[in-house]
Every structure is written in C-alpha cells, then in structure tokens.
Amino acid sequence: MSVSVIVMGAGGRMGTTITGMVRADGECRLAGVVEREGRREGLEHLGCQVAGTLEELLPGMPDAVVIDFTAPEASVHNARACARHGSGLVIGTTGFTEEQKAELADCALQTPVFWAPNMSVGVNVLLKILPQLVTLLGEQYDLEMVELHHNKKKDSPSGTALRLAECLAEARKWDLDTVANYHREGIIGERPHEEIGIQTIRGGDVVGVHTVYALGPGERIEVTHQAHSRETFAAGAIRAAKWLAQNRPGKLYTMSDML
C-alpha cells in the first residue's frame, strides 16, 4: 500500500531532502508540500499540491502522513491541525519546551503522532547501549559530551545531545536538570562527581556529530556518532511515516516504539 505524504517546509534544506527521497520511494506518494510565500520557487515541478498552510491540504487528504522538521511553535500548531483531521504526523523538530511536549502528547491521543529528536537509526541504537556502558563502567568514570553542528542550527544544545544526556543521567539515577553543566569559565573549582558536561560547537556545514566521553582512571572511552548527510534523517522520517500509517492514536510514539 502506498503511503501519501505531505512535507512541511519543503523549500528548506531538510524539506528538500525529504521530498526528493519520498518521490524516489516506491512505497510512498508525495501528495503535497507546504512552504511559506517567497520560498515556493521550484516546488511546482514536484507534481503535487503546493500550499502555504497545512490546513489548506488536510481536508482533501485525510489519510496522508505529514512529515515536519520545522520549528517548535510551528510543529505544535501542525499537530493541532492533524489532530482535528485525524492525520498522522512525524516530527523531527527539536527545541520543544516541556509544555510543548505535553501538548504533542495530548494531540497523540487523538491522532497518530511520532516524535524523535534524531531520526537516525544509529543514534537510537546508541541510546539503547549507552545505559549498559555506563552501568558496567561504574561510578569512577566521569561523563561528558560534545556536539557539533552547522552554523545555521538555531537550538543549542541539540535535541539529540539532550536526549543522550538524559540517557546518561537515567543510567546513573541522576536528575539531568541538576547535574547538567553547559558552561565552564573562570576559577570554578574541582569537577563535581555528579555532573554531565554538555559542550556545543557551531560552524560550517556539519550535519551533526555527537561524542560521549567516559573518563576514568588511566583510560578514556569515546563513543561518536557522525551523520554524513541529511539523507540519514530523511530516511528515518520516511520509515517512520510508513510505520505510523499502520498505527493508531494513544501515545506519543518514538523511535523506540518503531525499532
């Protein structure tokens, strides 16, 4: 069965990648794209409906699955629209507040909603194995993280870095809000044991690099994930759209559910 897909922000870097891969996927059909005025040039060649808002498309495409890598406020707005029309929604947006996440969860009770701060299969496998690594190493090892992204990225730290940090904190039974350190400067004293340093680098056109450090007596372990192209995230989002089309509302689905 072919899955109809609507792509939000189709004129952007991520949107362009997703639309191209949806069109090349034999199990999907590009039903429509959404982009604001002034960024729609070239979208008419896609052979689908082009609109300025999601609400223009959903009434005529109730079975379509929407893929959204836009911005937190826009994604929440789109989740509300999908909930009204019963359309599935795959979200790759990062930077949500706790209140916005709660609203997405509410929408997921009315229509299928899938959210992952990173659509890469590799990152999500990393989230599975990190707790075991941290537990086996024991309390003697300090935990640190560095994330690197392109100079256009708006949120810091990345959503992936925060999820990785949550994973580390959960393995140690710590509260991330209490132990996270995003900035070190000046005479700050010795490093507390219950701390996870999260450092950010921005520059160039780097798609995404995340490195977790476990630093112990006489040795250091580094676990790095590098995304070489946006196609990694687009492929994960398309896979999620196909999976979501077969599922019902009831919870905010994540990569753990799909994998």
Curated annotation (Swiss-Prot):
One of its GO terms (biological process) is lysine biosynthetic process via diaminopimelate. One of its GO terms (cellular component) is cytoplasm. NAD(+) binds at residues 9-14, 35, 92-94, 116-119. Signal peptide: none annotated. Catalyzes the conversion of 4-hydroxy-tetrahydrodipicolinate (HTPA) to tetrahydrodipicolinate. Belongs to the DapB family. This is 4-hydroxy-tetrahydrodipicolinate reductase. It comes from Oleidesulfovibrio alaskensis (strain ATCC BAA-1058 / DSM 17464 / G20) (Desulfovibrio alaskensis).
